[in-house]
From Swiss-Prot:
Any Pfam family the entry gives: UxaC
InterPro entries the record matches: Metal_Hydrolase, Uronate_isomerase
Superkingdom in the source lineage: Bacteria
Keywords: Isomerase
Originating organism: Flavobacterium johnsoniae (strain ATCC 17061 / DSM 2064 / JCM 8514 / BCRC 14874 / CCUG 350202 / NBRC 14942 / NCIMB 11054 / UW101) (Cytophaga johnsonae)
Enzyme Commission number, as recorded: 5.3.1.12
Pathway: Carbohydrate metabolism; pentose and glucuronate interconversion
Protein name, entry field: Uronate isomerase
Length: 467
């Protein structure tokens, strides 16, 4: 181990209680990564990457934003620079990311996957590139073996309703001991004002075998795909929305709006909101029928830089936190479902930290005793997926609800090297509790608090999702 490393056995663990909680109750728990954006083909085909850049930097908009901020030319971020030059420019950036979670993640990932404890910087970059690429090129670092290294029991990718789930099927009977599931992400069927909506419906119709001419046809097509996903092991849905849509509507209004859209006539913003509300209610009622968990990621302000969006497209690092009002529409939406006894298990993630207490109290309105932790306040997401953000989420949930019922961490990542984020979360959780034991705010009952830690690390998710 390098003398200048700060990644050691007790990283982030500030006292003996935190150390005991982590090492005895959390560290060795398997990982259930119930939401990510991994490529299922790479898992099913046990892909071996050419070099560290392809598995670590390509597709990682967290790193891209940092590099651009430092003044790195786009050629070496997403452009036509060589893989090695992109890595060297990332290495140049890393020392300047101190106090950003990228600094911790980077060194945790180098340590856990490659047993490298040197700090990544311009001086160490050549050596680390050579060493990591040599390992990455071997079977021991195939995608399936990368998942085994971190004790991943299950990964749940995210797919559009039109997806064939070809690679989930291919992997279904594997002998690795790893399960791969999928989450149903139908946002393209909801957002009627988006460019290409009609073309998307044509594709959805082809895949589902339903000619989509009316709103009833759209419902039938979506139900067909839910049935297909369910038959292939899907147990979750996911929605990435600025806010929950909930407007009063009638069936005749929705039929008329849908007809207008299919005739390529202009839809007003008010009509779009009514339509989106109708589709969302229909989907959520159907999720309840199939016993799925629905997830809502709320509050992102996306594609802010029109110039770069035109060049690079979405999910390339031009998004930020929005300040949309969340409480009233979310309450009305959940209440409408609950009133008909059609509210399924639900996880709500907020991107704006100002909404932490809003979400932490909202979930209590609809936890009716039918299921343990039925409605969940999700872990710190995206810009909040860091030490301060996760601590604030844990504190809000503890103060307003029951942290003991929390289903814990997820990566929400596109990278096969991001799984140490589970370790990061577990260390933060154990340190938070250990600190309160030390101060006398919690009893020195390691068996009971250790059970709580093990539950949040693994057991609660295992029971909640029933993969």
């Amino acid at each position: 181990m390098s003398a200048n490393t700060f990644i050691h056995d007790n990283f982030l663990l500030e006292n003996k209680y935190a150390e005991e909680l982590y090492h005895n109750y959390s560290k060795n728990q398997p990982i259930i990564d119930y939401h990510n954006h991994l490529n299922p083909q790479f898992i099913a085909e046990d892909k071996i990457f050419d070099n560290i850049t392809n598995v670590w930097i390509n597709g990682d908009h967290y790193k891209w934003r940092a590099m651009r901020t430092l003044g790195i030319d786009e050629q070496f971020v997403t452009g036509n620079g060589s893989d090695k030059d992109k890595f060297l420019n990332w290495a140049k950036t890393v020392p300047y990311t101190m106090r950003n979670p990228l600094y911790h993640w980077t060194h945790l990932e180098l340590a856990r996957y490659f047993d490298i404890y040197d700090l990544l910087n311009e001086k160490s970059a050549e050596k680390i590139y050579t060493e990591t690429t040599e390992k990455i090129n071997s079977q021991a670092y195939s995608t399936q073996n990368l998942l085994k290294k971190v004790n991943a029991e299950l990964v749940c990718t995210t797919e559009d309703p039109i997806d064939s789930l070809e690679f989930h099927k291919k992997f279904a009977n594997n002998s690795t001991g790893i399960k791969m599931s999928t989450a149903f992400r139908p946002d393209k069927a909801i957002l009627i004002a988006n460019d290409g909506y009609n073309a998307y419906l044509d594709t959805l119709g082809d895949v589902s075998g339903v000619a989509i001419n009316t709103f009833a046809d759209l419902q039938a097509a979506l139900r067909n795909r839910i049935e297909f996903f369910n038959a292939n092991g899907c147990k979750l849905s996911d929605h990435g929305l600025d806010q929950i849509y909930f407007e009063d509507f009638t069936e005749s209004e929705i039929s008329s709006i849908f007809k207008k859209k299919r005739e390529n006539r202009i839809i007003t913003p008010e009509e779009a909101l009514k339509f989106q509300s109708a589709v969302l209610i229909f989907l959520s009622e159907t999720y309840h029928e199939f016993g799925w968990v629905q997830q809502f990621h709320l509050g992102a302000l996306r594609n802010n830089n029109a110039r770069m969006h035109r060049i690079l497209g979405p999910d390339t690092g031009w998004d930020s936190i929005g300040d949309y009002p969340q409480a009233q529409k979310l309450s009305s939406f959940l209440n409408a479902l609950d009133s008909k006894d059609k509210l399924t298990k639900t996880i709500i993630y907020n991107l704006n930290p100002a909404d932490n207490e809003v979400m932490a109290t909202m979930i209590g309105n609809f936890n009716d005793g039918s299921v343990r932790g039925k409605v969940q306040f999700g872990s710190g997401w995206w810009f909040l997926d860091q030490k301060d953000g996760m601590t604030k989420q844990l504190n809000a949930l503890s103060n307003m609800g029951l942290i003991s019922c929390f289903v814990g961490m997820l990566t929400d990542s596109r990278s096969f090297l991001s799984f140490p984020r589970h370790e990061y979360f577990r260390r933060i959780l154990c340190n938070l509790l250990g600190d309160e034991i030390k101060r006398g705010e919690l009893p020195n009952d390691m068996e009971w608090i250790g059970k709580l830690v093990a539950d949040i690390s693994y057991n609660n998710a295992k029971e909640y999702f029933k993969f």
